[in-house]
Amino acid sequence: MAAAKPENLSLVVHGPGDLRLENYPIPEPGPNEVLLKMHSVGICGSDVHYWQHGRIGDFVVKKPMVLGHEASGTVVKVGSLVRHLQPGDRVAIEPGAPRETDEFCKIGRYNLSPTIFFCATPPDDGNLCRFYKHNANFCYKLPDNVTFEEGALIEPLSVGIHACRRAGVTLGNKVLVCGAGPIGLVSLLAAKAMGAAQVVVTDLSASRLSKAKEVGADFILQISNESPQEIAKKVEGLLGSKPEVTIECTGVETSIQAGIYATHSGGTLVLVGLGSEMTSVPLVHAATREVDIKGVFRYCNTWPMAISMLASKSVNVKPLVTHRFPLEKALEAFETSKKGLGLKVMIKCDPNDQNP
């Protein structure tokens, strides 16, 4: 009697509010791909947004799509042209893989390629499933002292690393991080690891600010009904001078305004959080003080640095994980994330290994 084929249980969004656990066929890797047995996948705000609204901006769910892009797993099969990986390797997955070598790839900014494959961004499937295939060049071996969960958290950490690179964070900088959600916290971690001397984190939530303090914020500032200018003054008071760098992770108009007012003349503000399409900001104030305003879109060339940070214990992402669920309870996990009950909710995809 033949052994039963393993199931490929997958979490699939069909449209706004329609989330299902379904069995998909186990994919066959192409020549430059690897088949992975998934282990840990974090829930991102974008996953919840696609479930709730069926779209993010111009990216619309038009057909069933597997969610998940913060992920790690184990190689179980390699394509014919893959040489750097073999079955048994533990890997972290970079979800954005170029489909072609276009002008952006040639200059190393493949995250800007309009044709890039990106997990769980329509129409591309993600990896919240038992088995998943991916471009082998965007799967990175994990050192023995880096856990699967840490490997999955390289994705959000990469957002923080890319933001800090775009902002030019360097030794001795004073940094303002607006927002103490997962992206604000990884930006804090990245800034400290890259040499920031002092970091202040702002948020509305006392509990989130408490977590920011736990993971390394030098100062925290709870926002209530202050004006942007008043917030900027408080930030300056905490740091002793204006921060050279502001990392704006909320996308909220008043927070962006406060960030511009707070940033030191000649400094840089990076926009990580995305809010309304049109936003009113004190542009003349920024221009006359030469405050550079830069956009941040995902990341590029960050996985090797992130792995080194984790392996050397320069950053500790473990406190970010507050809840864990097996894949079979993914719907409950998403409800937990939607209600804001957890900071980072992790789904364990391997029924035989639920360890971090």
Swiss-Prot record:
<feature type="binding site">
    <location>
        <position position="69"/>
    </location>
    <ligand>
        <name>Zn(2+)</name>
    </ligand>
</feature>
<dbReference type="GO" id="GO:0030317">
    <property type="term" value="P:flagellated sperm motility"/>
</dbReference>
<feature type="modified residue" description="Phosphoserine">
    <location>
        <position position="210"/>
    </location>
</feature>
<comment type="subunit">
    <text>Homotetramer.</text>
</comment>
<protein>
    <recommendedName>
        <fullName>Sorbitol dehydrogenase</fullName>
        <ecNumber>1.1.1.-</ecNumber>
        <ecNumber>1.1.1.14</ecNumber>
        <ecNumber>1.1.1.9</ecNumber>
    </recommendedName>
</protein>
<feature type="binding site">
    <location>
        <position position="299"/>
    </location>
    <ligand>
        <name>substrate</name>
    </ligand>
</feature>
<feature type="modified residue" description="Phosphoserine">
    <location>
        <position position="224"/>
    </location>
</feature>
<keyword id="KW-0472">Membrane</keyword>
<keyword id="KW-0520">NAD</keyword>
<dbReference type="GO" id="GO:0003939">
    <property type="term" value="F:L-iditol 2-dehydrogenase (NAD+) activity"/>
</dbReference>
<dbReference type="GO" id="GO:0046526">
    <property type="term" value="F:D-xylulose reductase activity"/>
</dbReference>
<keyword id="KW-0560">Oxidoreductase</keyword>
<dbReference type="Pfam" id="PF08240">
    <property type="entry name" value="ADH_N"/>
</dbReference>
<dbReference type="GO" id="GO:0031514">
    <property type="term" value="C:motile cilium"/>
</dbReference>
<dbReference type="InterPro" id="IPR045306">
    <property type="entry name" value="SDH-like"/>
</dbReference>
<keyword id="KW-0862">Zinc</keyword>
<feature type="binding site">
    <location>
        <position position="298"/>
    </location>
    <ligand>
        <name>substrate</name>
    </ligand>
</feature>
<dbReference type="InterPro" id="IPR013154">
    <property type="entry name" value="ADH-like_N"/>
</dbReference>
<feature type="binding site">
    <location>
        <position position="208"/>
    </location>
    <ligand>
        <name>NAD(+)</name>
    </ligand>
</feature>
<dbReference type="InterPro" id="IPR013149">
    <property type="entry name" value="ADH-like_C"/>
</dbReference>
<keyword id="KW-0597">Phosphoprotein</keyword>
<dbReference type="InterPro" id="IPR002328">
    <property type="entry name" value="ADH_Zn_CS"/>
</dbReference>
<feature type="binding site">
    <location>
        <position position="70"/>
    </location>
    <ligand>
        <name>Zn(2+)</name>
    </ligand>
</feature>
<keyword id="KW-0479">Metal-binding</keyword>
<dbReference type="GO" id="GO:0031966">
    <property type="term" value="C:mitochondrial membrane"/>
</dbReference>
<feature type="binding site">
    <location>
        <position position="183"/>
    </location>
    <ligand>
        <name>NAD(+)</name>
    </ligand>
</feature>
<comment type="similarity">
    <text>Belongs to the zinc-containing alcohol dehydrogenase family.</text>
</comment>
<keyword id="KW-0496">Mitochondrion</keyword>
<feature type="binding site">
    <location>
        <begin position="272"/>
        <end position="274"/>
    </location>
    <ligand>
        <name>NAD(+)</name>
    </ligand>
</feature>
<dbReference type="GO" id="GO:0006062">
    <property type="term" value="P:sorbitol catabolic process"/>
</dbReference>
<feature type="binding site">
    <location>
        <position position="50"/>
    </location>
    <ligand>
        <name>substrate</name>
    </ligand>
</feature>
<feature type="binding site">
    <location>
        <position position="203"/>
    </location>
    <ligand>
        <name>NAD(+)</name>
    </ligand>
</feature>
<keyword id="KW-0969">Cilium</keyword>
<feature type="binding site">
    <location>
        <position position="155"/>
    </location>
    <ligand>
        <name>substrate</name>
    </ligand>
</feature>
<dbReference type="InterPro" id="IPR020843">
    <property type="entry name" value="PKS_ER"/>
</dbReference>
<keyword id="KW-0966">Cell projection</keyword>
<comment type="function">
    <text>Polyol dehydrogenase that catalyzes the reversible NAD(+)-dependent oxidation of various sugar alcohols. Is mostly active with xylitol, D-sorbitol (D-glucitol) and L-iditol as substrates, leading to the C2-oxidized products D-xylulose, D-fructose and L-sorbose, respectively. Is a key enzyme in the polyol pathway that interconverts glucose and fructose via sorbitol, which constitutes an important alternate route for glucose metabolism. May play a role in sperm motility by using sorbitol as an alternative energy source for sperm motility. Cannot use NADP(+) as the electron acceptor.</text>
</comment>
<dbReference type="InterPro" id="IPR036291">
    <property type="entry name" value="NAD(P)-bd_dom_sf"/>
</dbReference>
<dbReference type="GO" id="GO:0008270">
    <property type="term" value="F:zinc ion binding"/>
</dbReference>
<feature type="binding site">
    <location>
        <begin position="296"/>
        <end position="298"/>
    </location>
    <ligand>
        <name>NAD(+)</name>
    </ligand>
</feature>
<feature type="binding site">
    <location>
        <position position="44"/>
    </location>
    <ligand>
        <name>Zn(2+)</name>
    </ligand>
</feature>
<keyword id="KW-0282">Flagellum</keyword>
